[in-house]
A protein has these predicted regions:
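Active-site glycine- and acidic-residue-rich loops that bind
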Residues: 124-129, 157-160
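Surface-exposed cleft-lining segments at the edges of enzyme active sites
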Residues: 115-127
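Charged catalytic cores and adjacent phosphate/nucleic-acid-binding surfaces used
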Residues: 1-37, 41-42, 46-48, 60-108, ...
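Internal, conserved structured core segments that host functional sites
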Residues: 129-148
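Nucleotide-state sensing region of NTPase/ATPase domains
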Residues: 332-387
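Phosphate-binding glycine-rich loops of NTP-binding sites
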Residues: 292-328
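Active-site beta-strand/loop signature of hydrolases that rely on acidic residues for catalysis
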Residues: 49-57
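Short beta-alpha junctions and helix-cap segments that line functional grooves
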Residues: 191, 324-331, 369-372
Length: 390
């Protein structure tokens, strides 16, 4: 069991397939595993763990970048960047073979059969079917998450001057999940979004629009998702941007004027906290829970052991006795002499410990690196527990 955490993501990454790339002359437009390995390695060094490969009008680079990402611990989503009458859109799919196939089906629907999405020089052509809202709706029908890249750019952004005449209708349609602040930092929509969005709160983010080695990872966004990012996790982040989207603190000087944008210096917790609970034996036998550094909610129906789990934590951490005698009896009944629990925590200095105690009533043991410390548990951890009806 895991918890939601902030992942640093760049959702607009181009490969040498892009005619305007500046990675160097040695790379081919065709998928190259060596380039993919170098790309994800550089992102990994920059702390980025989520990518979307967004080449114009093509998806063939996705498999090699995804493979390199799997080896480097980076989640890679298949995606497209397309131009609809000059307005650019991004469409992202689930990071699976099915997601890749859905993207290919969507791409095939954008031009008549036999018509190439590239011109004679290899440059991507604009979509020949539909307006911005219609193409965005088609992408959603193909299970894509649609974003507006460099949305304030003068010649290609949704809110760029003269780019999309009905940008307000598109912005309020619900078809586009997020809007990239990049393009024109002085754009009015960034400080006065109501003129375009009405009562809708825009989900702002920033991406790299990466085409060169220099600056990789500098323009990226923290997105709060589960420990294994999914397309649904991305969708939920954009739906609840006020709690799940943050720009890196280093970008504050550039984008602090954007209404609604929040910043984060470091997602890693610095306060004392419980980190894991492991129980062997008894009612909760085999339970292993990774605790979030903030609020944790234990959810379940009646009789599933929620209150008992709280009482086990109280008991193992030697945090006193419950006021309710039934609570103590419940713990003894479900956490008997053959059961043992370990509660792991990090103190204010960042040192990691484990408290281990069996259900036989013996004293709790404080361990560090698997070795007993000989110290009383309360010397290193103190918790306040309010059980049921307390």
């Amino acid at each position: 069991m895991g918890y939601s955490r902030f992942h640093l993501a760049d959702l607009q990454v181009h490969t040498p397939a892009d005619p305007d790339h500046e990675y160097g002359e040695g790379w081919s437009r065709d998928p190259d595993p060596a380039f993919a390995e170098e790309l994800v390695a550089r992102y990994r060094r920059a702390g980025v763990t989520v990518l979307a490969v967004t080449d114009h009008n093509r998806l063939d680079w996705y498999p090699v970048v995804r493979g390199a990402g799997e080896r480097a611990g980076i989640t890679v989503f298949p995606a497209l960047e397309i131009s609809v009458n000059g307005c650019h859109l991004l469409a992202l799919w689930e990071a699976t073979e099915r997601g890749h196939e859905l993207g290919r089906r969507f791409l095939a629907a954008l031009w008549p059969p036999g018509e190439s999405p590239f011109d004679s020089t290899g440059h991507p052509r604009v979509v020949s079917r539909g307006q911005v809202a219609e193409v965005a709706a088609l992408a959603v029908e193909h299970h894509a998450l649609v974003l507006a890249p460099h949305s304030t750019a003068p010649r290609s952004g949704l809110f760029g001057p003269g780019v999309c005449r009905n940008s307000d209708e598109v912005a309020q349609s619900g078809l586009i999940a997020g809007f990239d602040v990049a393009g024109g930092p002085s754009a009015d929509v960034l400080v006065n979004p109501r003129r375009q969005f009405g009562a809708v709160r825009p989900a702002w983010f920033v991406s790299g629009d990466t085409r060169r080695w220099e600056g990789i990872g500098e323009r990226a966004t923290y997105l709060k998702m589960s420990d294994e990012p999914t397309l649904e996790g991305l969708r939920q982040a954009f739906l609840v941007a006020e709690t799940r989207i943050r720009l890196p603190e280093r970008l504050r000087s550039r984008w602090a004027h954007v209404r609604g944008v929040r910043f984060l210096s470091d997602p890693r917790p610095t306060w004392p906290r419980l980190t894991h609970v492991r129980i062997d034996g008894g009612f909760h036998d085999g339970l292993a829970v990774e605790l979030a550094p903030g609020l944790n909610a234990v959810i379940g129906g009646k009789g599933t052991g929620k209150s008992t789990l709280i009482e086990i934590l109280r008991y193992v951490l030697d945090a006193g006795k419950p006021v309710d005698k039934d609570a103590a009896g419940n713990r003894k009944h479900n956490f008997r002499a053959n059961a043992e629990a370990g509660v792991y925590f990090v103190d204010e200095r960042g040192d990691e410990y484990e408290v281990r105690r069996g259900g036989d009533g013996g004293s709790p043991l404080l361990l560090r690196d698997g070795q007993e410390t000989g110290l009383a548990v309360r010397r290193r951890v103190s918790v306040v527990v309010f059980g049921q009806r307390e």
